[in-house]
Amino acid sequence: MMKLKAIEKLMQKFASRKEQLYKQKEEGRKVFGMFCAYVPIEIILAANAIPVGLCGGKNDTIPIAEEDLPRNLCPLIKSSYGFKKAKTCPYFEASDIVIGETTCEGKKKMFELMERLVPMHIMHLPHMKDEDSLKIWIKEVEKLKELVEKETGNKITEEKLKETVDKVNKVRELFYKLYELRKNKPAPIKGLDVLKLFQFAYLLDIDDTIGILEDLIEELEERVKKGEGYEGKRILITGCPMVAGNNKIVEIIEEVGGVVVGEESCTGTRFFENFVEGYSVEDIAKRYFKIPCACRFKNDERVENIKRLVKELDVDGVVYYTLQYCHTFNIEGAKVEEALKEEGIPIIRIETDYSESDREQLKTRLEAFIEMI
């Protein structure tokens, strides 16, 4: 099957993003680095600033991080810190300030060390989901707005906020369309291509992301009309994010006869689900408050989302993916596994890191799982 032109364009845009980003900085635009899907990018864009995801998906930077951080810590946290300490991530080096958030204990404490290396602002994300917690979160988003205005010198007007809300909602709309197309049999796109799309959506200029998504949807609609695509056991991945560089599990699944048709993760549905309904700071805050991350207490809607995706995408089996020492997702995995087994949905739990040492072992386990379902 011919390669998708939109994915080739995605790779080209990613290859030239560093040069483009530094040119945008030379034009006077501020860059806000971020780690997490909870950071409301509409606020940053409304001040003509640039939100950009930060590196954290490589094993190479972990040794330098372990000079300061414990070995028994999530590899994403160590890799991120190592990239900044080693000064090898262009997005870190371009960032005028980094926005952190109180999602997990490891990141919170790592930020105390990272703020020695780069200016930081930490958003307090309440872990409860009640009205009092929502009020706290709305205030945190208002504080972010004040910070962004101060850092950029640009006033965030109602008009600019409306423009950026509409633009980011457009990205969400296009990802929804992509997921609709993935319901087809055969699947019109490989999971690895979609993973790269999510990974780079955190990095690319938003207008480039929109253009690539529009082109991709046209190509996939054509494939669906022709009945072209990828056969195999249909797999939903759920769990920890897979930031750029961390493709191991998806690669293995598709090597052994599976096809990934959905991702319930921050490099997946949590990135785009739910539109901002309205144009106020409060409306923006409410949308992000709904994100069902495992760091939240009594995160029952995540379980329901997974069951819904299994049905909508006609999934044959679920791969629950956890990074080593990610206690939040690992513990919540027990609830997810129990709920899916009650529904008769096959599930396998995988715990791994960024190294290649367990690739063959994972390949054996995933191959057996796919044969079983």
Swiss-Prot record:
Its main location: membrane. It is an enzyme of class 4 (lyase). Signal peptide: none annotated. It is found in: Membrane. InterPro entries: FldB/FldC_alpha/beta (IPR010327), YjiM-like (IPR047678). The keyword Membrane applies. Its EC number is 4.-.-.-. It is a single-pass membrane protein. Pfam families: HGD-D. The chain crosses the membrane at residues 32-52. It comes from the Archaea. Keywords: Lyase, Membrane, Transmembrane, Transmembrane helix. GO terms for molecular function: lyase activity. GO terms for cellular component: membrane. Belongs to the FldB/FldC dehydratase alpha/beta subunit family. The keyword RNA-binding does not apply. This is Putative dehydratase subunit MJ0007.
